[in-house]
Amino acid sequence: MKVKSESEEGGGLERFGAYCKAVELFDLVVLDLSKHSSDFTLTRLIAQQYASADSIAANIEEGYGRGSRKEYTQFLVIARGSAQETMGRYQRFKHWLPEGIINLRTSLCREIIAILTATIKKLRDLEKAK
């Protein structure tokens, strides 16, 4: 059974708001942190931030590709956790990034989390109604 959810309305995954914002967030993480890549004390934190930001979009993609509503929902839960992780680490980057950047990025993370939360609820409600 192919998953039918808000992510498919009007044309598929690339029109799902959380996915588009997750891809945007990853690009911003790279932009924000690439200038700090020569600071060896930040190597691990930067790698973790790249990984958690990438994981948001990657888990949405994988869940979408699974084709079942139940699995898609589970991968959205994982993506939401990665968004939470990315947001928390941005807050801890306060020692190296300007406050304005941190506020913008954490706001974007909150938007992603809100969309994912609403979608998860909708998919779970549909699953219960079966």
Where are these regions (language model features)?
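Amphipathic alpha-helical assembly/interaction segments
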Residues: 1-130
